[in-house]
Amino acid sequence: MSSQIQGRYFGTGKPLFGLYFKTAILTILTLGIYRFWAKTRIRKYIWSATSGDGDSFEYSGTGLEKFLGFLVAIVILAIYLGLFQLLLAFIGISIIPEDDSQAAIAAQAVAINLSILAVLPLMLFAQYRARRYKMARTRWRGIRFGMEKGAWGYAFRALGYIFLTIITLGLLNPLATFRLEKYMADRSWYGDARFEQMGRWQDLYAGMKHVFIGLGIIIAGVVFAIVTEGVGIAGVAAVIGYIWLLIGLIYYRVYAFNYLTRNKVLDERVMFDAHLETGAVIKIFVVGTIVIGLLMAVIFGIIAGIVASMSSAIMAGTASPALFVGLAIPYALAFLIAGGLSLVMITQPMIKYAVESMTVLNAVHLDTIHQRAADTGADAEGFADALDVGGAI
Amino acid sequence: MQSVGRFFDGESGQRLSVDLSVDTAADTLKLSHPELPMGSQYWPLVAIRALSDHARQDQLVLSLKADAALDSALIVTARLTVDDPDMVSILRRLCPDIGRVDVPKGTTGRIAKRAGLAVGALVLMIFVILPAMANTLARFIPVEREVAYGKAVVKQMERFMGGRGDQGLTCTGSKGRAALDAMIARLTDAADLQYDLNVNVFDHKMVNAFAAPGGQIVLMRGLIERAKTPDEVAGVLAHEIGHVEARDTTRNALRAAGSAGLLSLILGDFAGGSAVVVVAEYTLTASYTREAEAEADVFALEMLNAAGADATAFATFFDSLSELERLTPDLPEYLSTHPELVDRAAAARAFARDQGVTTPILDDAEWAALKKICT
Ligand SMILES: [Zn+2]
């Protein structure tokens, strides 16, 4: 048994793309019902491609339980959303003035935002539940991961930290990142061993430096424009500052990931190391986006060409319905291909890069860890499925 | 056949390198290691399952068929990883159910129960609870707010149909306007309405009319052109007044707001899904309920009768609409949301038979002016 375990990832593009494409077609044919099985199968692939010390991870969730969890969630959501939206419309009509169109637009904006506020706590709740479900269905060497319940606690804290981050114009973002991750990490287990998030939230400010530089350039550009009344330089500064800010945000996420991983401890003994680099992450994203963009341009170009060459028939109304169906199919296929490519060319390479940049230290201690009792409360992520939270996989 | 596999007992994190051998006579796979209880385990080949969608083709991760459990967290956890290519191919060949997915007993019943509950809850919300709440709440909206809201709706409709600038689509021919006012006066003289009517004609070829909250009614130019007599226009107008007086539009707006997005919850976001959702939501919310339509018809017939106008016109307009329906497969909105034209025409004819003496609602000069209101 080695004392250090290097993460490895064995997944490749072709089989994953095939799996995505096949399950996406089934999803369309079943009017969306197969999507729970589709997501489960893709997770099984990605989990099983990940390995440490030669032993693969296992995703033991099932599409069936996801579907059943979803059915429960829509009952609750239908009642909650239906009543809330109707009451909101009632208040909108009876209180907010709508005599001129300006006010009507403002009223609509308010109503839409309130509606998001109604769903936001549920989405945060769903986020925690989704992570808990994924943990409970993840195994390595036959030992389950797990997470304690605490979704409402997470939702309320997250709401508070989001509010704090907004009113401090992002200055307290590191506090939110750190405390929310700590809330989740401290409730996480591998077998009968507990994780703990160490470190200090103030340490994350080092990762914010490029965000601050980007903002600084934008502000300096604006000040310069006001003082000298030269708009040209302000424009250049705005573009540079904006790009710097975007890259700075990625840098922050990578920095936070590395820091939080390095400061996690399992069972007070097992440590972790991660050294992702911002440049590599951006490269995966940019290369993937360019390749997919070019491919899609070609495919949609061909479809547009066919439409253009037949436009006289379409205008004259002599085009048969079969032609429209014949065009709709390649159009839908092109979307499926784009989805599959982004999974294979962006998501999977990112996972591979992250997994292979991670090391488990003092891994000998893992041998002494025992199985945990099953988390019967960690039922499927129905709310996450219904509200579409949880990201790429 | 001998080889080595990695065994995890599902209880501790310890990895055992077990010796594997297939006993073809007993149809079992033997796992042996000094640390195993009794030194060995026997896995029946029929009960061996491989984890599905496994990324590594050169490897099998095996488990034993679990006792049925719906909660996947409860499934038995012993795992055996086989990397040796010969052993992998032998096991693939000899284990009859290696790729099988075991579905626990009672699954179908459980799906049916939960799906039934979910569909039931949605149907109850969309067709019973939300309409009932909309009916109750609509009564608490002050009339002046309803009028303001209705005007905003009409303005939005106008922009949606292509109206731009100050005047938009509203037709302002003064003689036509006078004829329209005469028609409204004739219809409403005997009636005691709770709303001040604001009737306008939009310059649009669609054969349609609609009512918005607070007494707002819009007739399309296409509808006036399609009508053979002024009484046919009056019939449609009276029907829309019926919707206004019953507050159908306000209730509809509340109901539509409540059910918005509920369908997209179910269908999720897959390719083409959003288009289906939009169409389904439109048909669900753009139409009044069947009862509301029937009541508006009854209201219209009685209003025509009180004004001394011939209710037969109501029927002849339905006849000409159903003819239009046959000619053009893409239904105008008025038709698609007002079904069963033949039945409604018959009801109007039956009503007209009992009517006394009637007079045309407009004279020929006024009718000609109304037809030119948009020029
Ligand atoms: Zn109607």
Description of each model-found segment:
Chain A
Residues 1-16, 20-193:
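Transmembrane-helix bundle segments that line or gate the permeation/cavity pathway
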Residues 37-45, 123-139, 172-186, 248-265, ...:
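Juxtamembrane/interface segments at transmembrane-helix termini
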Residues 45-60, 134-152, 182-204, 258-282, ...:
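Juxtamembrane inter-helical linkers in multi-pass membrane proteins
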Residues 65-79, 203-215, 284-296:
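Select subsegments of transmembrane alpha-helices in polytopic membrane proteins
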Residues 81-119, 217-248, 296-343, 391-393:
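Membrane-helix interface segments in multi-pass membrane proteins
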Residues 169, 177-230, 237-238:
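Loop-centered beta-sheet repeat module
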Residues 177, 199-213, 217, 225, ...:
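Extended non-catalytic domains of envelope/secretory-pathway proteins
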Residues 250-254, 258-260, 271-274, 278-393:
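Intrinsically disordered cytosolic tails
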